[in-house]
C-alpha cells in the first residue's frame, strides 16, 4: 500500500495519487486529489468524473457459453457438482483484460475428475485473465466437458434475452464495468473571496485496470465529449426549410456540401433512406440497430458517435464517407441539371 501526506499547491492546479493499494487480485483502490479549485468547481468535476468512471470505461466479459452437453440453462449434468446455471454465474464473474475490437472465441476442454478454474480457459492472444484461481465447476466423475465461450469488450450492462437457442448456446449477463465504485468529496479552505476547494476522488477497480489507468481513461473520454463544442460555429449549417438542423462535426466533405448548397437551396435529407445508399450489409444492420434510418439521421452523428456503435470500426466510417460523398454529389448534380 502506498500512502502520502496531502500537500496542497496554492497556485498551480495539480492532481496527485495520495493512496494506492491492492486488496486482492480483483480489488484495487486509489485515492487522488485535485487542487486548488475555485468554489463550485470541485463538485462539477467530481460528478462528471464519477459518471465517466462508472459508465464510460470499457471492460471485457464472457457473454455467451455453448456446450453440446447442456440441454438448458437450469439443468444438471451427471458428473458435475454445479448446476448449469451456477456454471454460467461463475463464468460471469471471471475478470478479463483485453484490447479487443469485436468478439473473440475461447474454449474450456477438461477431463474429470477435478476442479475447473479460470486457468483452464484457452484464450485468444489479445485477452488475459486477472485471477486464474476463479472457480468455474467441479467434475466428480471421469467425464469430458467442453464449453465454447464468446468474449466481448463493451461498456455498461448487457442483459441476456431469455430464449431457446437451437445451437445450445446460452447468453450470460455481462457487466462491462472495470470500476466497481467511485466517490468524490470536497474540502474547502480559505476565507471570503479567496475560498478554494480540494477535490478527493476514490476509485475501486476489479483489477483489469488500476485506479490510475481508470482515471486517465475517464478523463480522455470526457475530453473527447467536449471537443465538438470547440468547433461548433465553423461546422454547423442549417437547411433552408427551417425544420431540420444538420450537424456535420468532422465529416471531411462538409465544405463541399456547403458549396453545393449555394447552387441549390434544398435537398430533403430526411426523405433519403439509408436503404438507398447501397451500404455493405454489416454496416447497414449496425446503423439500423442504432435507429439510424435516413440520411438526416446519419448526418446528425459525428464520426465519434458512429465509432461508438457496437461492432463499428473506423474503416466502416471511412466507407460510409466515401459512399455518401458520391451519392450526395450525384443527388446535387441531378438537382442542378
Swiss-Prot record:
Which residue ranges does the record annotate as region Alpha N-terminal domain (alpha-NTD)?
Answer: 1-233
Cite the entry's keywords alphabetically. Answer: Chloroplast, DNA-directed RNA polymerase, Nucleotidyltransferase, Plastid, Transcription, Transferase
Record's keyword annotation contains DNA damage: no
Compartment(s) = Plastid, Chloroplast
Q: Quaternary structure?
A: In plastids the minimal PEP RNA polymerase catalytic core is composed of four subunits: alpha, beta, beta', and beta''. When a (nuclear-encoded) sigma factor is associated with the core the holoenzyme is formed, which can initiate transcription.
Role: DNA-dependent RNA polymerase catalyzes the transcription of DNA into RNA using the four ribonucleoside triphosphates as substrates.
Q: What family classification does the UniProt entry report for this protein?
A: Belongs to the RNA polymerase alpha chain family.
Q: What is this protein called?
A: DNA-directed RNA polymerase subunit alpha
Q: Which gene encodes it?
A: rpoA
